[in-house]
Amino acid sequence: NASEYGIPYDAPPIVRRESIEVAPGRRVSFLVWGEGEPEYVFLHGGGQNAHTWDTVALALGRPLVAIDLPGHGHSDDVADPSRLSPQDNAADVAHVVRAVAPNAKVIVGMSLGGLTTIALAAHAPELVRRAVIVDVTPGVNSDKSKAISDFIRGPATFPSFEELLARTIEHNSTRTVESLRRGILHNAFQLEDGSWMWRYRRFPGGGVVGGVVTATEHPNWAPLWDLLGANTAPVLLVRGMRVQSVVDDADVAELMRRRPDAVVIEVVEAGHSVQGDTPVELAEMIRDFAAR
């Protein structure tokens, strides 16, 4: 990652995986970057995992925590898939943040992670001193997220890694093949029969649990607008401007109506996955926002 984006480093980064129990018999896993008290907490999008932030973490070069949301990555699943909403996620994330990053300067969330950040600020406002929301608002709907849901609703398993990679390339035209290959190796695993499967829980109908897609219809995240409007923590919205973005002008207008103090940055070269398309630039935005 560092070589691809020209990030200088003298030695391999210090990264370790840990987990804590958030409910009896259920654990949430996370990556701890660097030494010392974490300054940032990162929450990924639906169908992703903590490694989506690897390049951003390298560019920041500061102690931080990147969490695998429930039902994603190496975190345990939940028995009831309806219990993976942003509000449910926020309760689990609060356990982790209190335990390992209680003094984090900024919580950064992308897509599902962004909605979870909004919910976290309402659930545990003392943990969210500043919030960076990456390409999502409570105004997301099925039309805005169609390109993403089309990808997520694809096959659950693939006969070979090459076929999985080919589908991923088809739906992520802004990313390099090598970056997508690395991402898949963190977000999929090989079954005993040699086929490959995504490392996240899926709805029976083919959507991704807790993300912007359900088996039958799009969740209504509009109530999160009220939570966002009531919170007083400084907010930065990073909006991708390419076609896969799920934020439109009406969403930005609604954000500014409810939070006139919010900061909005438009990233021309990024789609929905700003951390994948322009990770170094995103890291700089986060660093600058934390210093305000």
Predicted regions and their residues:
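Alpha/beta-hydrolase fold catalytic core
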Residues: 1-38, 61-62, 101-103, 263, ...
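Active-site loop/oxyanion-hole signature of alpha/beta-hydrolase fold enzymes
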Residues: 23-26, 31, 55-58, 65, ...
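Active-site glycine-rich loops that stabilize anionic/oxyanionic intermediates
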Residues: 37, 45-48, 111, 241
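Serine-hydrolase catalytic-loop signature spanning alpha/beta hydrolases and amidase-signature enzymes
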Residues: 45-55, 64
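Conserved hydrolase catalytic core segment
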Residues: 102-142
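Helix-rich cap/lid subdomain of alpha/beta-hydrolase
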Residues: 139-203, 216
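Conserved serine/cysteine hydrolase catalytic core
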Residues: 191-258, 263-266
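Catalytic histidine-centered segment of alpha/beta-hydrolase-like enzymes
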Residues: 270-279
